[in-house]
């Protein structure tokens, strides 16, 4: 997973013994590397190239650190991009490991965390959704789960998207009638909910199904999610026939509907390969200086969907090197499957396979299919990669044209690389949030979005100008601190403010207070009756103006403003819902998440807890006599 030429072996040619007098023609970076070589060990490990600002430029791994790093002392033998990296290097740091496989895992984790500018980077770091069958209740529930997989949990996936999980969950509800409600809701029900009425839940909350029968349904769901769908369908068909022969047509109809739901979920998956088991299919395609990696997830022989990835800094590398770097970062977030099908082999096949085995806790095979059904899966993934990259290149071209048009419309020089759009959201000043949306040549840069919870107690509720002042001061004070030289990509080429002249002047004054007066600002005021298409634009030093109603730049700015509005409203709703969801139990010392869950599970609601007697509180698992007394006193201190 390094950018050194893979066909060039590590050399030990004495370059780690620098001359007593440094050659003045030697680049500074080479001198820094030679200085680091004096004390560098020959063990496996990870090295980091660091520039004068302390930023990590590159992370690499090696079986022998000294022999690997020696390669950098002769930059003329390396690609131009790596020569630039060496020239910027001021110091080096190393971390030793026991084995090269451990070094590979550490390298992947550091790249994912530090995002060095000269490494191939996996830009989409979103987690993948799973289906979880809970194990802490007599009647387990089946739910969508996203996040770090907890030890002891029972998870099925990953799925490529939330939509793929939702459709599978819907089919599972229809087929197995498992509950999805939270435990406190389950404990407080006195009659079946709507899901029982529409035949998506067996209503164990009100004893409409015996515990043994419900456990049988759970086992069937496990079997289906584990890939035993054919055996399950055969068993259901047999039971349907038996019920029909016994003239129990109502029960036969239930089995028929369950078979239909199972068939439906399988028919919605384009490709299924029952013999594949647990595997990911990975192919990639390069064009126009960009790379697309396509991943299909197969679990239990079923296609759980696919996702496209567009790694950064991959244009100068070949497909094998891109795939190798991708594997390390991609599987840093979740355990790899038992088999990974690849379009082409990678330079360090055995090493990567060994590292993935360490990460997974079981054997992982990297396979390059040459023929048969597995090769067809690779070809299908490659076709998807080509299509996805073609769409992205077309969108990037259109986006660059729009950014160029925006620069012309507002009298700005040069291409726009980063445009920031701001909007506020609140209800009568409560739970106010400012939202920052970022766009660039490749579209919306969602990883750069930021929300600002309005904190100042001096702001009058509903004062949009004061809210925007706070947002701007916080945003650009941080930029001045973290990127004073404006070379880390944190400074915008244009700032769009959702508001007219008053809002624009408030922003200008706020930025002037912190010494920022050279960021281009534009106010976007809605037209009469807030009509889209009649916006007026306010640029400092120019009279207000409008764009032609059919100008593509106008539509582009409307889209940016709508995205900022959507993001700000979503952030406001999240903040408001958190405030609404605060429980009276949260203010009781000693009551954490697990004890709160136990209390709600036992009593059904926070109100019931507050009304409970001391003896009842002591009966709850995990609540000691002393804590029960503290809890009781908290709710009865005035009575």
Curated annotation (Swiss-Prot):
Recorded superkingdom: Bacteria
Record-linked CDD domains: GIY-YIG_UvrC_Cho (cd10434)
Low complexity composition-biased segments: 17-27
UniProt-listed InterPro entries: GIY-YIG_endonuc, GIY-YIG_endonuc_sf, GIY-YIG_UvrC_Cho, Hlx-hairpin-Hlx_DNA-bd_motif, RuvA_2-like, UVR_dom, UVR_dom_sf, UvrABC_protein_C
Keywords: Cytoplasm, DNA damage, DNA excision, DNA repair, Excision nuclease, SOS response
Region (Disordered): 1-28
Acidic residues bias (residue ranges): 1-16
Domain UVR: 230-265
Molecular function terms, GO-annotated: DNA binding; excinuclease ABC activity
Cellular component aspect of the GO annotation: cytoplasm; excinuclease repair complex
Main location: cytoplasm
GO biological process per UniProt: nucleotide-excision repair; SOS response
Database matches in NCBIfam families: PRK00558.1-5, uvrC
Name the record gives this protein: UvrABC system protein C
């Amino acid at each position: 997973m390094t950018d050194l030429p893979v066909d060039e072996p590590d050399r030990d040619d004495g370059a780690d013994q620098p001359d007593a007098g440094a050659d003045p023609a030697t680049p500074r970076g080479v001198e820094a590397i030679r200085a680091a070589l004096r004390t560098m060990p020959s063990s496996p490990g990870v090295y980091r190239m660091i520039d004068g600002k302390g930023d990590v430029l590159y992370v690499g791994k090696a079986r022998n650190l000294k022999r690997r790093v020696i390669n950098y002392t002769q930059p003329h033998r390396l690609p131009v991009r790596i020569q630039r990296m060496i020239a910027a290097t001021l110091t080096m740091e190393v971390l030793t490991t026991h084995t090269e496989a451990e070094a590979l895992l550490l390298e992947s984790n550091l790249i994912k965390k530090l995002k060095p500018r000269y490494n191939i980077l996996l830009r989409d770091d979103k987690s993948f959704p799973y289906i979880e069958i809970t194990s802490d209740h007599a009647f387990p529930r089946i739910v969508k789960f996203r996040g770090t997989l907890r030890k002891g949990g029972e998870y099925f996936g990953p799925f490529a998207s939330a939509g793929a999980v939702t459709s599978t969950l819907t089919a599972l509800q229809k087929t197995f009638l498992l509950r999805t409600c939270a435990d406190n809701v389950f404990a407080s029900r006195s009659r079946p909910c709507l899901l029982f009425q529409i035949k998506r839940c067996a209503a164990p909350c009100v004893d409409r199904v015996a515990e043994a029968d419900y456990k049988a349904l759970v086992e069937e769901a496990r079997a289906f999610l584990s890939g035993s769908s054919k055996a399950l369908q055969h068993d259901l068909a047999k039971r349907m026939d038996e019920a029909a022969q016994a003239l129990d047509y109502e029960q036969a109809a239930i089995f028929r509907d369950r078979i239909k739901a199972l068939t439906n979920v399988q028919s919605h998956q384009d490709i299924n390969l029952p013999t594949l088991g647990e595997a990911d299919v990975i192919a990639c395609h390069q064009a126009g200086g960009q790379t697309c990696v396509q991943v299909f997830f197969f679990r239990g022989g079923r296609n759980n969907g696919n996702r496209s990835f567009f790694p950064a800094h991959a244009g100068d590398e070949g497909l094998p090197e891109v795939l190798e770097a991708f594997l390390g970062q991609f599987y840093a977030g979740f355990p790899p499957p038992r088999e990974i099908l690849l379009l082409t082999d990678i330079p360090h096949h055995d090493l990567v396979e060994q590292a993935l085995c360490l990460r997974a806790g079981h054997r992982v095979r990297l396979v390059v299919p040459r023929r048969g059904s597995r090769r067809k899966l690779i070809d299908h993934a490659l076709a998807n990669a080509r299509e996805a990259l073609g769409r992205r290149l077309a969108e990037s071209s259109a986006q660059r044209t729009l950014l160029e048009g925006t620069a012309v419309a507002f009298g700005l020089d040069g291409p726009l690389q980063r445009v920031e759009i701001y909007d506020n959201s609140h209800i009568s000043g409560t739970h106010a949030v400012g939202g920052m949306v970022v766009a660039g040549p490749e579209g919306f840069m969602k990883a750069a979005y930021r929300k600002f919870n309005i904190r100042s107690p001096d702001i009058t509720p509903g004062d949009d100008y004061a809210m925007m002042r706070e947002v701007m001061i916080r945003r650009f004070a941080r930029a001045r601190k973290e990127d004073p030289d404006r070379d880390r990509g944190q400074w915008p080429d244009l700032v769009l403010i959702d508001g007219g002249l008053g809002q624009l002047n408030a922003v200008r004054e706020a930025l002037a207070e912190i010494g920022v007066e050279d960021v281009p600002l534009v106010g976007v005021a809605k037209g009469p009756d807030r009509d889209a298409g009649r916006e007026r634009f306010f640029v400092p030093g120019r009279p207000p103006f409008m764009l032609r109603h059919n100008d593509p730049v106008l539509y582009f700015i409307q889209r940016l403003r709508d995205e900022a509005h959507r993001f700000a409203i979503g952030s406001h709703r999240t903040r408001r819902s958190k405030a609404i969801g605060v429980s009276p139990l949260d203010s009781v010392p000693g009551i954490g998440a697990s004890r709160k869950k136990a209390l709600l599970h036992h009593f059904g609601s926070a109100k019931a807890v507050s009304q409970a007697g001391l003896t009842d509180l002591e009966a709850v698992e995990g609540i000691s006599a002393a804590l029960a007394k503290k809890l009781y006193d908290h709710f009865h201190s005035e009575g």
